[in-house]
Structure formats: C-alpha cells, structure tokens
C-alpha cells in the first residue's frame, strides 16, 4: 500500500511540472477518537490528543480564475487519550496519505490572500500503538485502524506574499475520517482540528 501511494505521488509530481506553487507544510493535529462501541471504555472519558503533521504539496491553476487544484503527500499523527484513577489508555498512530482538493483565492488585499479550501485525503496507517495501563500493543493491523481511510477536510488559510519568492501561510483545517468497508460493530472515526504553517514557492512555467 505504501508503495502504491509513493508511485501515485511520483506520477503527480511529473504531471505538475508546470505547477504554480510547491509548498512545504507543517502543523499540529488536535485529535478526538469517536468510538462506535464506547461501552468498552465505560468510565474512562476520551480526551483529545495532539500530534504532528508534515506535507509536501503542489498547487495548479485551473481554467477558472482564482480556482486552484492542490495535490499533496503527507504524514499525519492522530493521537488520543482516555482514563481515570483506575485505568489509562493512549493511542499513537501515524498515517501516510495522498491529498487532493480545491483552493479558491477568495480575497486579495495587497500582499495578503484569504483562501478557503476543501478536499479529501486517502490514507493508510504506517505506525500504530495502544498503551493500556502501561502495557503497549501494536494496533497497526487491527481492522479499526488498518486499510484505507477516507478523510474529507474543510478549511481556510491566510497567505502573505514574500516579494517574488512565494508566500508564507497560516491555516486551519477540520476533518473526520471514515472507512466504508468496515463492518465491525466497534470502529473508530477520527475527528481532527489541524493548525498548519506553510512555505510556498513559485515554480516557473
């Protein structure tokens, strides 16, 4: 699965040699796990956890003014906590994924652009651990976490132009994952609020 994602991204990279921008994005994910069988953790309220986000992305102009296509390869950490005085749980997971979406340069005031964005991320787990009262278990092969996850997202960012080199940006995204093929009674939806800092460089056509 990881090889397929890498091959797809390489194809996109060659396809986007005429892209307008290449960007490097980092940020923080604030993640909440929504368990569809919460009775498993009765008396141990779930809490949001934080993790890192890294991405390289391309931005392409469309045939419509101000509307852009975006493609990216990213690594997301989705972590969460639960516990009380008797029991404690921790989840630490990392997902590698391909992202595609749209951005619209809604407002431009001097060197500042306000950009809403929407898209979807197709991701697969590359690392997964669960800690239960100090004991650590590998969950990367558990059906709730393994396989492909579809992660639609919605967000916005503010871009500030740095002369002719490109832009810096600060943004916010919200996403909720789902796995259509999963039939288990217990499965996990991952709800994430993401803060993103980006460096954007113009690419000559």
Regions found by a protein language model. Give the residues of each.
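Short glycine/proline- and aromatic-enriched beta-strand/turn motifs that initiate or cap beta-hairpins
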Residues: 19-65, 69, 200-205
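Flexible, solvent-exposed loop segments that connect beta-strands
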Residues: 33-46, 77-95, 126-146, 181-188, ...
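Gram-negative (and chloroplast) outer-membrane scaffold detector with strong preference
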Residues: 57-134, 193, 197-205
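Predominantly the C-terminal beta-signal and adjacent terminal strand-loop region
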Residues: 78, 144, 149-205
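Residues that define the transmembrane beta-barrel architecture of outer-membrane proteins
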Residues: 20, 48-52, 75, 92-98, ...
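A structural signal for short, well-ordered beta-strand segments
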Residues: 10, 26, 71, 118-120, ...
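Outer-envelope beta-barrel architecture signal
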Residues: 4, 20-22, 65-69, 110-116, ...
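Bacterial Sec-dependent N-terminal signal peptides
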Residues: 1-25, 112, 199-205
């Amino acid at each position: 699965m990881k090889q397929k994602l890498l091959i797809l991204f390489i194809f996109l990279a060659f396809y986007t040699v005429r892209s307008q921008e290449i960007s490097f994005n980092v940020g923080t994910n604030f993640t909440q796990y929504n368990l569809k069988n919460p009775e498993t953790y009765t008396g141990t309220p779930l809490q949001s956890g934080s993790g890192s986000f890294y991405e390289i992305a391309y931005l392409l102009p469309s045939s419509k003014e101000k509307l852009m296509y975006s493609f990216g390869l990213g690594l997301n950490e989705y972590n969460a906590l639960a516990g009380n005085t008797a029991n404690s749980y921790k989840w630490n997971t990392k997902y590698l994924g391909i992202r595609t979406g749209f951005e619209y340069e809604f407002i431009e005031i001097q060197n500042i652009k306000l950009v809403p964005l929407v898209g979807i991320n197709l991701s697969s787990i590359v690392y997964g651990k669960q800690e239960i009262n100090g004991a650590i278990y590998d969950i990367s092969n558990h059906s709730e976490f393994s396989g492909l996850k579809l992660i639609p997202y919605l967000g916005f960012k503010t871009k500030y132009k740095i002369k002719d080199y490109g832009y810096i940006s600060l943004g916010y995204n919200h996403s909720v994952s789902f796995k259509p093929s999963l039939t288990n009674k217990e499965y996990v939806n991952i709800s994430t609020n993401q803060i993103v800092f980006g460096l954007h460089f113009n690419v000559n056509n």
